[in-house]
Amino acid sequence: MSLGIKRKKTAVAEPKIHFSWKEAKRQKSLLIWSGIIVIYGIIFYYLPLGGWLMAFQNYRPIDGLFHSEFVGLQKFQQLFSDATFLRVIRNTLAMGVINLVVTFVAAIAFAVLLNEVRNTIGKKTVQTISYLPHFLSWIIVTGIIHDALSGTGIINELLVNLNVINQPINFFAHKEYFWPIVAFANVWKETGWNAIIYLAAITAIDPSLYEAASIDGAGRWAKIKHVTLPGIRPTIMILLLMNVGNVLNAGFEIQYLLGNGLVQSVSQTIDIYVLNWGISQGDFSIGTAAGIFKSVVSIVLIVIANQIAKRNGD
């Protein structure tokens, strides 16, 4: 039954933003630094996008960007008809996915296990040691890997002494070893550093959840499964979303430094392909087209990952 009572709708006033020269003067330092950041972004991130025009031209440095012959999508057709580029895409995707999965799982596992260490001194020592490889350049890391996996290196000596092999293996002459070597190098170098954010997420979990699990008789593994991992799931999803777009950034330094003619068919990535065409052979148009392809695919991967995350409610 309606009582005939009409309720007045109260309008919510939207906050108005007033520009004040006095406030601007007070925030002068902040505005100056903000302006510097904006200018930096325009100069180094947006203006270089004009170079994408080279992908649609038969670019010659002598003619310049605005006077080179326009060829449309011819360079892209040439790119995708090149069997080498298709192989490079395979290598980049394979190494990117392997590195993403292996380093992702390794960082989560390391953070969870390190959180279970009760000895404070031991825990901090392990943390510090695990961070150190991140600060080494890839040149140093590849040098260490070369020495360790050489014919007289520690790995071959260990395998021979354990009678696993009879003769030393030339790891850098066999294609089947290259991707695992790259994956191991990434895990060794970045696991400790990548685990920092997971350790921070674990410390933010409500301790009462662990206490309740202990009352219910849960052991360490049960707490990890039902408390720790669900507690850091949002962090995992966010980092996964951020890293999916970097799948095609499988690397350049380590592949370039460890690669050689014997493993070239599995070591070349898109970045190395761009270097070979754009710098070594001087075909800037092909190099730019390959770079655009990489950027577009990365954006598509981010959008897809974002949609999947939304559907899963994360």
Predicted regions located by residue number:
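Short, Lys/Arg-rich, polar N-terminal cytosolic tail immediately upstream
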Residues: 1-24
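A structural signal for multi-pass alpha-helical bundles of membrane permease subunits
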Residues: 22-314
